Curated annotation (Swiss-Prot):
NCBIfam families: PRK01749.1. Its main location: membrane. The gene is dsbB. This is Disulfide bond formation protein B. It is found in: Cell inner membrane. GO terms for biological process: protein folding. GO terms for cellular component: plasma membrane. Required for disulfide bond formation in some periplasmic proteins. Acts by oxidizing the DsbA protein. Residues 32-49, 90-144 are periplasmic. GO terms for molecular function: electron transfer activity; protein-disulfide reductase activity. It comes from the Bacteria.
Length: 176
């Protein structure tokens, strides 16, 4: 399996497939926000930014999958997925155990050199409350789904990183 992941990480197809999954999740989030009129909270926006990190990592990996740039893409992928798990877990705890003493921020605070909420307000401006449960599917809230999604991204990313140190098996069909 690790040899298979090693081969996949050196081709564009797997990276583009990951980009497609992240893009679909981003489009679903925008559908929830602009069509279903669910108001994203600050944690939702941070989770969205982590998903954009995974999307960016996959596009970086697709640019030059056979070069050392692939390692940078894998590390960005792992970092974004890890932050996504942390954010989604914190968001889940805010929803499952609401407290007047533990709340999320009122406004998103991106770095001054990357004010995404100013550049793309339709995507990165928060208007909801983190403790409010707005959507449920199969008895799980949205942040609970995101814990699983980000954990899957993280698990696969760690396997891909480990596979980089496995030598691919040579397929020499005519040497026997």
């Amino acid at each position: 399996m690790l040899q298979f992941l090693n081969r996949c990480s050196k081709g564009r197809g797997a990276w583009l497939l990951m980009a497609l999954t992240a893009l679909v999740l981003e489009l679903v989030a925008l559908y929830f926000q602009h069509v279903m009129l669910l108001q994203p909270c600050v944690m939702c926006i941070y989770e969205r930014a982590a998903l954009f990190g995974i999307l960016g990592a996959s596009l970086l990996g697709a640019i030059a999958p056979k070069s050392p740039l692939r390692y940078l893409a894998i590390f960005i992928w792992i970092y974004s997925a890890w932050k996504g798990v942390q954010l989604a877990w914190t968001h889940t705890m805010l929803q499952l155990h609401p407290s007047p003493f533990t709340t999320c921020d009122f406004f998103v605070s991106f770095p001054s050199w990357l004010p995404l909420d100013k550049w793309f307000p339709a995507v990165f401006v928060a208007s909801g409350d983190c403790a409010v449960k707005q959507w449920e599917f199969l008895s799980l809230e949205m942040p609970q789904w995101l814990v699983g999604i980000f954990a899957a991204y993280l698990f696969i990313a760690i396997l891909v990183l480990i596979s980089q140190f496995v030598k691919p098996k040579r397929r020499d069909l005519f040497s026997r």
